[in-house]
């Protein structure tokens, strides 16, 4: 499922401010008159503006939107100036480069933002971001494959949907609360076993073994169109919302005693545990909940319709 976030909450409040003095001092006349030349020297090509690096005597650069645009363009000549920033007191708190024409994030070496959105850019290499203290990072629809540069970051939200990421090992021990990995070629999720994830999206991932989720304090998990067959690792957890539509799951028995309030599943695939599903304290139940639509109903409507369909199918 493609997220439609507004860079909560840090990037959702981007304020474009203009700081600093644009006034220029008049140039003083030269102390010595220039010597005459025989012929006019050919015009020299102006070099690209140098990046705004801190001077040795300075503790840090006082950033403005203008200097940030210059810094980004220095490393990305094709940059179109579309970035948005949240800058407070000369410090870049958050920036959104969603859809921008950038391939190089070396500009990140001189700033310490808490939230960054690089979604829908051709970015592939995150090494210049190594050691940053990001809390939110959005990489959806990028070419990023290797997450090792973000190892050790205090990330709470990470969105990887539709990237070629296969390995989540770099996320081990992160304080992640939300992980969106829709459409990634991920088969092994053991790297998140010790993360305090509450919201997890794995739609269209080829993952089959979800044993790692037994130790994760999930509130909501989407396993839509995965290869998951066995729900036993979820048994006894505090999970409230579960989406297992279009999966090879056939047995709902492991859900017994759980406090689920929403269940999305494929009834035609279920051969055991329907009675367990009927005993759950569900508020919503359905067979579809994705970008294409949803058909959630209260149990009082869903189960009579389900029973009628089963009875009709049983008639010769």
Predicted segments — roles?
Residues 74-103, 112-124, 128, 132-145, ...:
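Concave beta-strand-loop units of leucine-rich repeat
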Residues 1-7:
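Bacterial N-terminal signal peptides that target proteins for export
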Residues 20-39, 45:
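Short, low-complexity, disordered segments immediately C-terminal to signal peptides
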Residues 7-13:
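Sec-dependent N-terminal signal peptides
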Residues 52-79:
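Surface-exposed cap/linker segments adjacent to membranes
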Residues 15-18:
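C-terminal motif of bacterial Sec signal peptides marking the signal peptidase cleavage site
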């Amino acid at each position: 499922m493609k997220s439609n976030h507004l860079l909560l909450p840090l990037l959702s409040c981007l304020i474009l401010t203009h700081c600093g003095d644009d006034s220029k001092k008049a140039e003083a006349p030269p102390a010595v008159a220039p010597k005459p030349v025989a012929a006019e020297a050919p015009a020299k090509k102006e070099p690209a503006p140098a990046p705004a690096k801190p001077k040795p005597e300075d503790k840090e650069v006082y950033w403005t939107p203008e200097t940030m645009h210059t810094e980004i363009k220095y490393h990305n000549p094709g940059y179109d100036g579309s970035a948005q920033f949240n800058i407070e007191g000369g410090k870049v708190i958050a920036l959104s480069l969603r859809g921008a024409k950038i391939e190089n994030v070396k500009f990140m070496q001189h700033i310490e933002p808490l939230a960054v959105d690089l979604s829908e850019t051709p970015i592939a290499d995150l090494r210049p971001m190594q050691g940053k203290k990001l809390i939110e990072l959005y990489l959806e629809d990028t070419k990023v494959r290797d997450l090792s540069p973000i190892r050790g970051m205090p990330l709470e939200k990470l969105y990887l949907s539709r990237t070629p990421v296969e390995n989540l090992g770099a996320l081990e021990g992160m304080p992640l609360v939300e992980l969106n990995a829709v459409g990634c070629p991920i088969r092994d999720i053991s790297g998140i076993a010790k993360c305090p994830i509450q919201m997890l999206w794995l739609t269209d991932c080829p993952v089959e073994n979800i044993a790692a989720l037994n130790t994760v304090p999930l509130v909501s998990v989407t396993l839509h169109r995965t290869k998951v067959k066995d729900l036993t690792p979820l048994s006894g957890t505090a999970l409230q919302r579960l989406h297992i539509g279009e999966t090879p799951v056939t047995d709902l028995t492991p859900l017994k005693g759980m406090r689920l309030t929403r269940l999305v599943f494929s009834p035609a695939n279920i051969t055991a545990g329907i009675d367990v599903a009927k005993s759950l304290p569900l508020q919503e139940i359905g067979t579809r909940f994705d970008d294409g639509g949803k058909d959630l109903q209260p149990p009082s409507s869903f189960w009579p319709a389900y029973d009628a369909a089963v009875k009709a199918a049983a008639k010769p």
